[in-house]
């Protein structure tokens, strides 16, 4: 793990394919050690700040449990718990927290915010999610894919992302494919494709690593032979209702359902989702969607697929913690370098 100590974790393309693989290997080892009761605390005495300008269940729990497992202490600064960007500039916040903490996680808005924190904090800064990138999620996804196809290299796997691919998930998937050589297919209406410049950059890198990146509106063509089908929510609670109708009309044909799974022609195809998922009407938003748009069987994914044997979303959710732990150990522990 040489080269990781005191390094930031802001986006995947900051790393080489070898570095990404070493992080995944460390995550697998830390997971195995925890399961067998052999985990060694390498972050004892470390203090970690968790800045959340956007709430999250999985990201917060993953960072907190990972830190506690490794002997570190955390301070949670929620959306109303800090003055970042309001009464105190990001630059000043970084310099203050950097004097008190050994590492800082940021989950919130623009990528420029986490980049500024990294520039001025003087300690490792980790991107828990920005509008542009979600690198910790992709680490968990890659580990999950390795676990479910242990005999295959990434450049022998086909990953399909169906839905709105112009968000942080789409961008980070492009970066992951660039580094691993995945056969990545973004199956989405053209209005939901990522920025062309990032696609071009990542496609060239992916091809160097034995992979390919395809963007298509054709569901049947896009999912053929897939090993994994991935999706994410179409709408968020904070968005205007007018956006809901527009987004659902745009994406309805890209719902992950039993037909899409069958179109892969692969009886072993697995389903991935970064969660939370609107697969039923058991949530406030899910219920509203069902009532207003007739999506009673699920929105971006049907309940049938979500609850099927093909669904590995909870393996994926657990792996958030193990991979985040690997990032913290690699960047904060001299014992691991």
Curated annotation (Swiss-Prot):
**InterPro entries in the cross-refs:** Asp/Orn_carbamoyltranf_P-bd, Asp/Orn_carbamoylTrfase, Asp/Orn_carbamoylTrfase_sf, Asp_carbamoyltransf_Asp/Orn-bd, Orn/put_carbamltrans, OTCase_ArgI
Pathway recorded for this protein: Amino-acid biosynthesis; L-arginine biosynthesis; L-arginine from L-ornithine and carbamoyl phosphate: step 1/3
Does the record carry Chaperone as a key word? no
Question: Any keyword Lipoprotein?
Answer: no
Q: Which GO terms describe its cellular component?
A: cytoplasm
Query: Which residues take part in binding carbamoyl phosphate?
Result: 56-59, 83, 107, 134-137, 274-275, 320
The principal location of this protein is cytoplasm
> What are the protein's UniProt keywords?
Amino-acid biosynthesis, Arginine biosynthesis, Cytoplasm, Transferase
Q: What class of enzyme is it?
A: transferase
User: Where located?
Assistant: Cytoplasm
The Gene Ontology biological process terms listed for this entry are: arginine biosynthetic process via ornithine; citrulline biosynthetic process; L-arginine biosynthetic process
- GO molecular function term, any single one: amino acid binding
| Entry's EC annotation | 2.1.3.3
- One family from Pfam that matches here is OTCace_N
**Which sites bind L-ornithine?**
168, 232, 236-237
Q: Which PROSITE patterns match?
A: CARBAMOYLTRANSFERASE (PS00097)
Reactions catalysed, as given in the entry: carbamoyl phosphate + L-ornithine = L-citrulline + phosphate + H(+)
Q: What does this protein do?
A: Reversibly catalyzes the transfer of the carbamoyl group from carbamoyl phosphate (CP) to the N(epsilon) atom of ornithine (ORN) to produce L-citrulline.
Task: Report the sequence similarity comment from the record.
Answer: Belongs to the aspartate/ornithine carbamoyltransferase superfamily. OTCase family.
In Swiss-Prot or TrEMBL terms, this protein is called: Ornithine carbamoyltransferase
């Amino acid at each position: 793990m040489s080269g990781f100590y005191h390094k930031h974790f802001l986006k995947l393309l900051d790393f080489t394919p070898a570095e990404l693989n070493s992080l995944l290997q460390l995550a697998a080892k830390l997971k195995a050690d925890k399961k067998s009761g052999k985990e060694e605390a390498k972050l004892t005495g470390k203090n970690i700040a968790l800045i959340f300008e956007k709430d999250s269940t999985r990201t917060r729990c993953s960072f907190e449990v990972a830190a506690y497992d490794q002997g570190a202490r955390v301070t949670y600064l929620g959306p109303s718990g800090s003055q970042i960007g309001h009464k105190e500039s990001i630059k000043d916040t970084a310099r203050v927290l950097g004097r008190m903490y050994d590492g800082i996680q940021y989950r919130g808005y623009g990528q420029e915010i986490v980049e500024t924190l990294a520039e001025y904090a003087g300690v490792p800064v980790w991107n828990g999610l920005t509008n542009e990138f979600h690198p910790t999620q992709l680490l968990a996804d890659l580990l999950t894919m390795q676990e479910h196809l242990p005999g295959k290299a990434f450049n022998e796997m086909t990953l399909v992302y169906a839905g709105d691919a112009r968000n942080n998930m789409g961008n980070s998937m492009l970066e992951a494919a660039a580094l691993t050589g995945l056969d990545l297919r973004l199956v989405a209406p053209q209005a939901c494709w990522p920025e062309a410049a990032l696609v071009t950059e990542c496609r060239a890198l992916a091809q160097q690593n034995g992979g390919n990146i395809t963007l298509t509106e054709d569901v049947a063509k896009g999912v053929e032979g897939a090993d994994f089908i991935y999706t994410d929510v179409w709408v968020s609670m904070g968005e205007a209702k007018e956006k809901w109708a527009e987004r659902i009309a745009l994406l309805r044909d890209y719902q992950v359902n039993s037909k899409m799974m069958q179109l892969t022609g692969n009886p072993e195809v697995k389903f991935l989702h970064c969660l939370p998922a609107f697969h039923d009407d058991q949530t406030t938003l899910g219920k509203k969607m069902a009532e207003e748009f007739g999506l009673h069987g699920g929105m971006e994914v049907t309940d049938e697929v979500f609850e099927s044997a093909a669904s590995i979303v909870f393996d994926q959710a657990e792996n958030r913690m193990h991979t985040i732990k690997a990032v913290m150990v690699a960047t904060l522990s001299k014992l691991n370098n």
